[in-house]
C-alpha cells in the first residue's frame, strides 16, 4: 500500500514537471519556436480552436515563423489571435501564409520573461509540494487505520521527501535553463 502511494505521487510529480516544461516552452525567447503558439486559440466556425490544429507552423529562419492555414478562410482569425496575444509579435499576411518575425528582446522584456519563467516554475513546485502533502496525508491515514506501522510510515515519509526534492530540483533546472536562454543575446 505504501509503495502504491509513492508510485502514484511520483506519477503526478512527473506530470507536474512535464506541465511546467510545456509552460516554459510558451515563453518567447529571441528565437523562433513553434511552441510559443501552444495554447493560442482562434475562432474556427464559431468554435475556439488551437492555432496548432488550424495550420502548420514551420521555422524557415532562426527568427521567423511561417504559418500556413489548412483553410485560407481562417487566415484573418489566426492573424488576429496572434496580434491580440501577449506574445509581442506582429504577423504579416501575404494571402497564402502568415510570416511572423521574432524581434530581438529588449533587456526589460527579457527581465519580464525571466520573471514569468520563475513564476511558472514556482507554480510547478507548488503543485509538486501539494502532491507530497496529499501522499503524506495518505501515509498518516494508513498508520492511523493500522494498515502500516509507525517505522514504515516514517521511512516512507523520508523517502517521499527525497523524491519531492528530486522533482523540485528538476523544475529548478528547467527554470535556470530557460533563464539562461532568455538572457542570451
Swiss-Prot record:
Keywords, sorted A to Z: Cytoplasm, Protein biosynthesis
Major place of residence: cytoplasm
Domain of life: Bacteria
Position of the signal peptide: none
Disulfide-bonded cysteines: none
Entries under Pfam families matching the protein: RRF
Assigned GO CC terms: cytoplasm
Cellular compartments annotated: Cytoplasm
Gene Ontology terms: biological process: translational termination
Molecular function terms, GO-annotated: ribosomal large subunit binding
InterPro entries linked: Ribosome_recyc_fac, Ribosome_recyc_fac_dom, RRF_sf
Annotated family: Belongs to the RRF family.
Stored PANTHER family: MITOCHONDRIAL RIBOSOME RECYCLING FACTOR PSEUDO 1, RIBOSOME RECYCLING FACTOR
Function: Responsible for the release of ribosomes from messenger RNA at the termination of protein biosynthesis. May increase the efficiency of translation by recycling ribosomes from one round of translation to another.
UniProt-recorded name of the protein: Ribosome-recycling factor
Amino acid at each position: 500500500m505504501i509503495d502504491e502511494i509513492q508510485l502514484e505521487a511520483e506519477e503526478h510529480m512527473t506530470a507536474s514537471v512535464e506541465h511546467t516544461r510545456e509552460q516554459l516552452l510558451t515563453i518567447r525567447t529571441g528565437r523562433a519556436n513553434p511552441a510559443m503558439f501552444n495554447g493560442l486559440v482562434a475562432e474556427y466556425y464559431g468554435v475556439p480552436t488551437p492555432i496548432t490544429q488550424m495550420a502548420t507552423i514551420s521555422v524557415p529562419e532562426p527568427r521567423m515563423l511561417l504559418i500556413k492555414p489548412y483553410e485560407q478562410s481562417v487566415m484573418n482569425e489566426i492573424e488576429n489571435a496572434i496580434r491580440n496575444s501577449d506574445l509581442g509579435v506582429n504577423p504579416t499576411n501575404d494571402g497564402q501564409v502568415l510570416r511572423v518575425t521574432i524581434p530581438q528582446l529588449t533587456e526589460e522584456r527579457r527581465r519580464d520573461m525571466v520573471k514569468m519563467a520563475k513564476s511558472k516554475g514556482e507554480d510547478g513546485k507548488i503543485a509538486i509540494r501539494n502532491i507530497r502533502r496529499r501522499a503524506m496525508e495518505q501515509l498518516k491515514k494508513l498508520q492511523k487505520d493500522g494498515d502500516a506501522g509507525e517505522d514504515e510510515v516514517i521511512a516512507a515519509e523520508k523517502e517521499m521527501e527525497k523524491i519531492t526534492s528530486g522533482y523540485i530540483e528538476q523544475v529548478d533546472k528547467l527554470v535556470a535553463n530557460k533563464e539562461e536562454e532568455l538572457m542570451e543575446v
